[in-house]
Every structure is written in structure tokens, then in C-alpha cells.
């Protein structure tokens, strides 16, 4: 069955990674928060997700690591309730399970800092994703991470981590 990006809104936890050498990692410490198109990945990157047929491509507007040699793209399919991603440019397979089916607001602001760096603030239900100023965080709106980042969104800017970030593009309803 085809996977539609619109079906993927919510918090996902990686249940399995199978590498090119057959190695397996079943640790569930990798999370991915998906909004309308915006996403934040706990491995340290964020940006817009694009879909071309059954292939999802994660564009990394914010990336804490140097760019890899290939685009981050995976062919997606359902195996029951498990979302299976198979590498397009690299040999791997990841199995994702929905960690939380979130109801409520879904919005994102693609940001620019005063020094020109990119950032992203998104919200899906009661969770938020932040990427910018050297950090990537997924947490609860109003929770300790939100408070520590000093996030204060408005229509045309977001105050966070001691800076005023300009909103370059937004999607969905209000983040606050």
C-alpha cells in the first residue's frame, strides 16, 4: 500500500535499523517528529520533507553534521502498522513505529537568525520540534526543553535561545 506523507504526521520511533553489512540496531532512541511538511529528527537534522511517488526525501535545512555524499531519500511502504524505509542512494532499511498519534495544532515556522543561520520550530499536538543554534530538540510544548530554549513565537518572528529569528515561511496554524 502506498504511503502518503499526510498519513505520517506525528511522532515516530525507529524500532529497527538494518545496515548494508546486515548489522541490526533495535534501540528505540531515534525519534522523528513529522508535521505537514516540516520535520525534526533527533539525530540532529530538520527541514522540509518532500514526496515523489513512494520516495520520501528529507531536505536538511538544519544539520548538526556535515552533509553526506547522497541525498537523504528512502522508498516507503507499510508493513502492517510499521512504516518501512529502504534507502534509495544507500543500502539500509529502517522500521518506524508511531510513538504517539497526536491531535491538535500542526504548524511550523522555517526561520532565519540575525546572522543568517537557518532554524525550524514546529508543533504537532502537544509536542514541538526545534532545530537551530547548534541544537535539535523534540519535547513537550511548555515543558522543560521549551522553557530552557526560551521559545516565544509570534506571527513574524520567534524569540528563542536569546535571539530573534525571522519567519521566512510558515505552514499550518499558529505554533503557540
Identify the residue ranges that each predicted region occupies.
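Lipid interaction determinants
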Residues: 1-44, 55-176
